[in-house]
């Protein structure tokens, strides 16, 4: 097969721990580039500047027995000191790393309103749900229940999430799909086979450092990449966890708001449960209506409210400890947990379903991390949130020691009479904030899953110009509201909603535990004993809690379980259909024999202009191009196959956005452009801006390609006369500058924008110009060829740019199984017709659009 030229705009180099060691890196400065043999994945279709070595059709001759190894420029070398610091110069950094101290304090203050609302409102209902399953018989029951709550708080939110899981973020991005993305960067586990080796040269893609556990990590990587079953299991696990996150986004508002509004029954005797439901519905409508105003704006508003709430929890707790029974401090002795189970047996086991509610919101700490930094979340939780929560629970326990009958409304009954109405007011505000916390986490998770091909396309609005992670999804917002209202109206019992709440939360927790364990083995490469201890302790505890809530699934929580199954089905069907479609496109791509037969005119008329043909292939000529050739009376003089590809990184730097390749020879004027985006990237550019960036990147690619050819030809000439011209070796720097590799090294440089011909003069200027004067004629021809091609691009651009899109219909083959026909022909087709159209998603103007229909038989 012929080869295809590849040139990447990457400015960084992957640090591969499997080769070389770091001693070689010190040989050059950290900003220098090097030339390496072209990767296998960068070779596919023939290219050449001239006709040398090519047959009459213009494509590479099949008679060449020795493959031609093209040299490509990699990114700059990474200094060993940068490796030790785990930093790469120029690599994208987290949005929050360069903030001032004052800004970090303000950021920590905002975390109260965005991250901790969910876990902060858990005292409203935890004891109420626990004692509904295991009624209080004596004071020791209260001590045992408090001990369970305290150690659950310490074990799950603090140790697991704040101290461990937060560090598994993907460049500041948290959530289930962020963990999956992090694993995908280190092992090819995606079921859609569109990975390229060139993706690993993105500066933010990977940073591997040798360590003693590397061999174990490589073995695990090999197993994951070679086992289709393991890939599917991992995908199912991630989709199940994501569906539980979405379910959590439904049940959290229902639980928090109804618990807060239910306090009216304590203050006003005439208030009934039906009235509580009606007020809760009104509050929920207001809550979801305010969601569009963004996290930054709302964070400044709700931050003070949550601060007052946490201070109220601590104040009420201290008051009750002083007034009632301070002996509840005995609950810090874990032996009371044993006594609690010994006295209450099966009821104590059921009570675990209520106990886990004290840790609800733990996943939001991680999922909402994209809005804030790890340090701000850790600082706020340890210094403010955890102490206030523990004092609040201890205060309720002190009150219940002498008032067993008030266990059904433990929180509001423990509030002093003079402070009841202010606390009720701030509790409702806090409940609304808590609901918003999980909704924002759901938005983040859906955006990640959409970018990674596991959820239908939706309209995403970025609510902040400064921070890309702050988003709002209108369709999902109103969908969550509708389902939430159904839950509130159909399940009016706090106990039943609490059971559903625990089920959704535990589903996400168990998924996170397994994924973080894989990260420990594959990426962190820490001691196996620590990994096993983490998995056994946390997964074991979560399974015990889950066994409690699943036993009560018939009490009404089955609604949330059904909802989660539906969301899982949507995501799996979308991923399955997308995978089949991509595989079909790969199978049906046009062969190089056909391209050779068509010739440079492609068997039709070439009209002036540029055609941007959007497709999903990263290699080969898409089949839809053949449909355009047979359908349209003419095709554009220049065609660029544009592939919008999301890579498993949060952000792709702008200077590494486009990866260009030449398809066939120069006379064909065919190129492939892979526009790479991270799942956190905001695609806000207009079509004019996108066209401008694309054309500029194409020109840079052509210039650098010409320089490669020039360097290769110079290298061949210099092989016979290296002693006469010691300064003839040249590299290209990261900014496009050309460096002479004479003695001393890097003695001088020439700017990329200067014509190549200017660097080749007569022999009396050899000391100032690195090129051999004997190659003046060949360089002149190369320069003229370069200028002609650049002029051709400019004229084509002036003639206009047209977007060529294929409107594909996906159908299952007639010989397919019935289930496959049902899934593809009905479910997947329904999702495609009702998701956001590709035209809107790509910002393609209607006046510059051409579409051709095509049916894919999968």
Curated annotation (Swiss-Prot):
Probable potassium transporter. The keyword Transport applies. This is Potassium transporter 7. Residues 1-68, 707-731 are annotated as: Disordered. Pfam families: K_trans, K_trans_C. It comes from Arabidopsis thaliana (Mouse-ear cress). Keywords: Cell membrane, Ion transport, Membrane, Phosphoprotein, Potassium, Potassium transport, Transmembrane, Transmembrane helix, Transport. The chain crosses the membrane at residues 105-125, 148-168, 233-253, 270-290, 298-318, 346-366, 381-401, 414-434, 471-491, 497-517, 519-539, 553-573. It is a multi-pass membrane protein. The modification Phosphoserine is found at residues 719, 721. It is found in: Cell membrane.
């Amino acid at each position: 097969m012929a080869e295809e030229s590849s040139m990447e705009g990457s400015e960084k180099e992957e640090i591969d721990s499997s080769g070389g060691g770091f001693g070689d890196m010190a040989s050059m400065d950290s900003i220098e580039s090097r030339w390496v043999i072209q990767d296998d994945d960068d070779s596919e279709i023939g290219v050449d500047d001239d006709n040398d070595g090519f047959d009459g059709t213009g494509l590479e001759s099949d008679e060449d027995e020795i493959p031609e190894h093209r040299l490509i420029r990699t990114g700059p070398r990474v200094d060993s000191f940068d490796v030790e610091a785990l930093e790469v110069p120029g690599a994208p950094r987290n949005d929050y790393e360069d903030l001032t101290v004052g800004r970090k304090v303000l950021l920590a203050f905002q975390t109260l309103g965005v991250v901790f609302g969910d876990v902060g409102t858990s005292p409203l209902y935890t004891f109420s749900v626990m004692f509904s399953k295991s009624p209080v018989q004596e004071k020791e029951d209260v001590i045992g229940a408090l001990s369970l709550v305290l150690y659950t708080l310490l074990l799950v939110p603090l140790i697991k999430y704040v101290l461990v899981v937060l560090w598994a973020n993907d460049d500041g991005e948290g959530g289930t799909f962020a963990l999956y993305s992090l694993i995908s960067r280190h092992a090819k586990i995606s079921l859609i086979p569109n990975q390229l080796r060139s993706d690993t040269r993105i500066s933010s893609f990977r940073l591997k450092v040798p360590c003693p556990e590397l061999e174990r990590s490589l073995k695990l990587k090999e197993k994951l990449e070679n086992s289709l079953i393991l890939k599917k299991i991992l995908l199912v696990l991630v989709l199940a966890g994501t569906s539980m996150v979405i379910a959590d986004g439904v049940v959290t508002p229902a639980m928090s708001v109804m618990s807060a509004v239910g306090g009216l029954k304590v203050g006003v005797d005439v208030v009934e449960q039906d009235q509580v439901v009606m007020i809760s519905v009104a509050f929920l409508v207001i809550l979801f209506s305010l969601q569009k105003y963004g996290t930054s704006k709302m964070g400044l508003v709700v931050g003070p409210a949550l601060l007052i709430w946490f201070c109220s929890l601590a104040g009420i707790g201290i008051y009750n400890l002083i007034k009632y029974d301070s002996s509840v401090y005995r609950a810090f002795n874990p032996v009371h947990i044993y006594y609690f189970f010994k006295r209450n047996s099966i009821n104590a086991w059921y009570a675990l379903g209520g106990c886990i509610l004290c840790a609800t919101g733990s996943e939001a700490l991680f999922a909402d991390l994209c809005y804030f930094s790890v340090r701000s979340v850790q600082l706020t939780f340890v210094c403010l949130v955890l102490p206030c929560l523990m004092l609040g629970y201890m205060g309720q326990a002190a009150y219940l020691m002498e008032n067993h009958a008030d266990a059904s409304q433990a929180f509001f009954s423990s509030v002093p009479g003079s402070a009841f109405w202010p606390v009720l007011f701030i509790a409702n505000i806090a409940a609304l904030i808590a609901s918003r916390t999980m909704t924002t986490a759901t938005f983040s998770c859906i955006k990640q899953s959409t970018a990674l091909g596991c959820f239908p396309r939706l309209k995403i609005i970025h609510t902040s110009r400064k921070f890309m992670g702050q988003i709002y999804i209108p369709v999902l917002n109103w969908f969550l509201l509708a389902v939430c209202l159904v839950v509130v109206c159909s399940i009016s019992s706090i106990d039943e909603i609490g059971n559903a709440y625990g089920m959704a939360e535990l589903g996400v927790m168990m998924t996170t535990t397994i994924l973080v364990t894989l990260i420990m083995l594959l990426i962190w490469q820490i001691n196996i004993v620590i990994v096993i201890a983490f998995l056994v302790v946390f997964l074991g505890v979560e399974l015990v809690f889950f066994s409690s809530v699943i036993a009560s699934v018939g009490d009404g929580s089955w609604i949330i379980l059904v909802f989660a199954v539906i969301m899982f089905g949507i995501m799996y069907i979308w991923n399955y259909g997308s995978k089949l479609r991509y595989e079909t496109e790969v199978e049906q791509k046009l062969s190089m024999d056909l391209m050779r037969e068509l010739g440079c005119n492609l068997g039709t008329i070439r009209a002036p202009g540029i055609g941007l043909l959007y497709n999903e292939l990263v290699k080969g000529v898409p089949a839809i191009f053949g449909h355009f050739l047979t359908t349209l009376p003419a095709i554009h003089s220049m065609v660029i196959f544009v592939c919008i590809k999301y890579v498993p990184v949060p952000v792709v730097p702008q200077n590494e956005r486009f990866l260009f390749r030449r398809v066939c020879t120069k006379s064909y004027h065919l190129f492939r452009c892979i526009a790479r985006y991270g799942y956190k990237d905001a695609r806000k550019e207009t079509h004019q801006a996108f066209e401008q960036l694309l054309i500029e990147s194409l020109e840079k690619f052509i210039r650098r390609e010409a320089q490669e050819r020039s360097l290769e030809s110079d290298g061949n000439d210099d092989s016979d006369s290296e002693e006469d011209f010691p300064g003839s070796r040249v590299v290209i720097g990261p900014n496009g500058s050309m460096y002479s590799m004479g003695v001393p090294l890097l003695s001088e440089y020439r700017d990329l924008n200067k014509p190549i011909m200017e660097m080749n003069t007569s022999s009396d200027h050899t000391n100032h110009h690195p090129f051999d004067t004997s190659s003046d004629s060949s360089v002149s021809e190369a320069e003229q060829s370069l200028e002609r091609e650049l002029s051709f691009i400019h004229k084509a651009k002036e003639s206009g740019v047209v977007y060529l899109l294929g409107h594909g219909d996906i159908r299952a083959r007639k010989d397919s199984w019935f289930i496959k026909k049902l899934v593809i022909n009905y479910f997947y087709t329904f999702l495609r017709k009702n998701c956001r159209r590709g035209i809107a998603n790509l910002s393609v103007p209607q006046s510059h659009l051409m579409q051709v229909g095509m049916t894919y038989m999968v």
